[in-house]
């Protein structure tokens, strides 16, 4: 099976989430092969490890893989003007998706 680069999508927390005490950003990584990769999170370019949870790769129906990575912050840590980044390293290649929540409101 040929190598397949990951497709990375970064989801912001919903308003419903923001009213709770926790905020979760989701980085969905799909369509990759082989099934090993590394997901890193950064806030304003600074690596973050606390509050990060990444699932084990699961096989899709097309024999490629997908993982989800979650960054959970307490509301006090949530800064709409910050830049949140999800970086995926797969087979020596890096894909990074960034979002600034202030741009979305």
UniProtKB/Swiss-Prot annotation:
Pfam families according to UniProt: C1-set
Alphabetized UniProt keyword annotations: Disulfide bond, Endoplasmic reticulum, Immunoglobulin domain, Secreted
Localization (cell): Endoplasmic reticulum; Secreted
Region C region, annotated ranges: 1-105
Annotated ranges, domain Ig-like C1-type: 6-100
An annotated GO cellular component: endoplasmic reticulum
Reported function: Critical for B-cell development.
Complex formation: Associates non-covalently with VPREB1A. Interacts with SYNV1/HRD1 (via N-terminus); this interaction leads to increased IGLL1 ubiquitination and degradation in pre-B cells, possibly through a lysosomal, not proteasomal, pathway.
Protein name per UniProt: Immunoglobulin lambda-like polypeptide 1
Name of the gene this protein is made from: Igll1
């Amino acid at each position: 099976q040929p190598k397949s680069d990951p497709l990375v999508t970064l989801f912001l927390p919903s308003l419903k989430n923001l009213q709770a005490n926790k905020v979760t950003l989701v980085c969905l990584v799909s369509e990759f092969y082989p099934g090993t990769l590394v997901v890193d999170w950064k806030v304003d370019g600074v690596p973050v490890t606390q509050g990060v949870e990444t699932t084990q790769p699961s096989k899709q129906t097309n024999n490629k893989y997908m993982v989800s990575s979650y960054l959970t912050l307490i509301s006090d840590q949530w800064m709409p003007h910050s830049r949140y980044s999800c970086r995926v390293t797969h087979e020596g290649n890096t894909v990074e998706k960034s979002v600034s929540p202030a741009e979305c409101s």
